[in-house]
């Protein structure tokens, strides 16, 4: 189940400029739920009859697990139907297959490329040239963005990428440096120029998933600063796993200082027909103080995000573990905040 929430900070919501974006890259510190949020975002963007591609680049088969489908092959398959007739397809990019596709596309090495795979040359090439891996991944992503159907219209209305975590996202997107380390010209260089242009355009937005905890927020702040220095477009910060405050602001402030009106609490319980033993009642008061302290600390951390002046979305806690149903609930929460 998904709980209602308030983080204590003011949520800016989804600005209209993001509604025209076609490439959404979702990153976040490990453990913040970035894969879950990427999946929910894809469902939201697909609502209303749109067609969205959800891309995985780290080989973990996380998309398959989230949508409860078999492991994904290296091809685009429908995995979900969105609200009002939309469709979400998924692609788990296999780096070796992408390399062979690249060799066949630019060098006509179809048969030779397959032979390279059999002798392990593909794995060898991507290992000794780490930048090549990111060039191939971003190149494939760009191809899905620009691909047209027989009517010369984009095949997909939007592409959502479950991108590498914040600690690696800048390097992953720094295609210019990766290519300069690999080639000064030729097909690799030419293709990468198109990737760079797309990543720095208003067609792209990078969304950072975080929790209202010190380490995730600090890593988010550092990643935003690094991405801004690279002049890459920041879309939003998505605060995941918020918890409800339950208390009015004035009561919350007092409880955080250890002040709880025990008589009022007991009277309220009795009015509701609840009578607790003294030990249980004392435990309830202790939990109230602990909860208020936690909410207050989260609100203080949220102030660091306020200072960014970056659009912020807030998502509630999924209490019983993430399943397909909770993905749709999170998607609805995003839609209520203007995501479209």
Curated annotation (Swiss-Prot):
Top EC class for this record: hydrolase
Outcome of gene disruption: Deletion of both bagA and bagB does not reveal any conspicuous growth defects in vitro. The double mutant is fully virulent in the tuberculosis mouse model. The double deletion mutant is not hypersusceptible to arsenite in culture medium, but it is significantly more susceptible to nitric oxide (NO) and it exhibits a glycerol-dependent recovery defect following mouse infection. The double mutant is hypersusceptible to extracellular methylglyoxal, suggesting that the glycerol-dependent toxicity is due to heightened sensitivity to methylglyoxal generation.
Organism name: Mycobacterium tuberculosis (strain ATCC 25618 / H37Rv)
Entries under SUPFAM superfamilies matching the protein: P-loop containing nucleoside triphosphate hydrolases
Gene name per UniProt: bagA
UniProt family annotation: Belongs to the arsA ATPase family. BagA/BagB subfamily.
Protein name: ATPase BagA
Domain notes: Binds nucleotides asymmetrically. The two ATPase domains of BagAB are spatially separated by the large central cavity and they do not physically interact with each other.
Subunit and interaction comment: Forms a heterodimer composed of BagA and BagB. Interacts with Rv1509. Also interacts with a large number of proteins, including proteins required for mycolic acid biosynthesis.
Disulfide bond annotation, renumbered to this chain: none
Additional free-text comment from the UniProt record: Was identified as a high-confidence drug target.
Biological classification of the source: Bacteria, Bacillati, Actinomycetota, Actinomycetes, Mycobacteriales
Documented EC number(s): 3.6.1.-
């Amino acid at each position: 189940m998904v709980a209602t929430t308030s983080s204590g900070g003011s949520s800016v919501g989804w600005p209209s400029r993001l509604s025209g974006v076609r490439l959404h890259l979702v990153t976040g510190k490990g453990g913040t739920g970035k894969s879950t949020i990427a999946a929910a975002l894809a469902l939201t963007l697909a609502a209303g009859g749109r067609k969205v591609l959800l891309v995985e680049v780290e080989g973990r088969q996380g998309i398959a697990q989230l949508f409860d489908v078999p492991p994904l092959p290296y091809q685009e398959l429908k995995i979900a139907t969105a609200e009002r007739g939309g469709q979400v397809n998924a692609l788990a990019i296999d780096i070796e297959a992408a390399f062979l596709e690249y060799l066949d596309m630019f060098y006509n090495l179809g048969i030779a490329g397959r032979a390279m795979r059999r002798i392990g040359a593909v794995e060898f090439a991507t290992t000794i040239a780490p930048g090549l891996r990111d060039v191939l991944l971003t190149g494939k992503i760009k191809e899905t963005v620009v691909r047209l159907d027989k009517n010369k219209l984009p095949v997909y209305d939007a592409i959502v990428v479950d991108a590498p975590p914040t600690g690696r996202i800048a390097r992953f997107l720094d295609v210019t440096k990766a290519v300069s380390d690999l080639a000064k010209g030729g097909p690799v260089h030419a293709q990468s120029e198109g990737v760079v242009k797309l990543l720095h355009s208003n067609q792209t937005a990078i969304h950072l998933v975080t929790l209202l905890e010190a380490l995730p927020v600090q890593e988010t702040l550092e990643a935003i600063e690094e991405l801004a220095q690279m002049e890459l477009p920041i879309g939003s910060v998505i605060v995941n796993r918020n918890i409800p405050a339950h208390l009015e602001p004035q009561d919350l402030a007092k409880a955080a200082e250890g002040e709880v009106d025990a008589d009022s609490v007991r009277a309220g319980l009795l009015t509701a027909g609840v009578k607790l033993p003294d030990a249980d009642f004392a435990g309830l008061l202790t939990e109230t103080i602990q909860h208020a302290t936690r909410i207050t600390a989260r609100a203080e951390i949220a102030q660091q995000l306020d200072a960014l002046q970056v659009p912020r979305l807030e998502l509630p806690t999924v209490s019983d573990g993430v399943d397909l149903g909770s993905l749709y609930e999170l998607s609805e929460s995003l839609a209520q905040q203007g995501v479209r």
